[in-house]
Amino acid sequence: MADSKLKIDIRRDRILEQLRQKGKILVSELSRELGATPVTIRNDLDALERDGYLVRIQGGALLRARPSVEWRGEQETIAHLAEKQAIAQAVAAQIPDGSTLFLNSGTTSQCLANALRAHRSLNVVTNSLAVATELGRQPLIHVILLGGEINTQYGFTYGSDAEEQLRRYQAGWAVLSVDGVSARGGVTSFHAEETAIDRMMIAHAKHTIIAADYTKIGRTGFTHICDASPEIQLITNSPCSPEAIHDLELLGVSATIV
């Protein structure tokens, strides 16, 4: 039986995670770790190469080199772009003009920045270079970019300086792009250095929206941001796992599927 689109996307996301961590991956290792045939893994690598994520080599792949002046999202292809744009539009529809909001880094946050461009009198506090660049061009949106250390691969700031600055602010909304949302694991990320920023954004906001495409639902990342609870509103898209959504709703999470 052919793989479902959800299964394929999750597997390819995991391949990319390993590639970003190691810089080089082998078909034999991926086949063993992901429980897929070598032919399936090679097809995945070929597809990811076409999308611009990697360079194929004999027996595996290398992370595609990028100029050091770029950050993720500036010129990189965004996986599941249409889905993330739909989620971003749904989030933007809930943010009134005149709001103050926190935005973290991530490709869904970048899509939200694009969706917010027509808003008026927004105050946006972010640690994302791409979000700050996009919204900073809009004359009716005031942007504060948190200072601190820079993750040059993914284009976000973090560390004690960024956290100290964030402590000064309160917001109506915290909108977070994350790597996993599940009843058991809660809201999670693969970027440990950014987790403290994410937690503080939630603590200093009246409302929290988790914007995550369907591949993140039922999945658990490396570091814990917060529990799944009634304080969280989740906006995601089909074809997310109905079982995972049901389990989240049992914990009081408000889930919207666009």
Describe the residue ranges of each PLM region:
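Conserved phosphate- and dinucleotide-binding cores of soluble alpha/beta proteins
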Residues: 2-13, 17-30, 35, 50, ...
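HTH-adjacent hinge/linker in prokaryotic transcriptional regulators
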Residues: 2-35, 39-102, 113-119, 125, ...
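Glycine-rich beta-strand-to-loop/alpha-helix junction loops that act as flexible
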Residues: 104-106
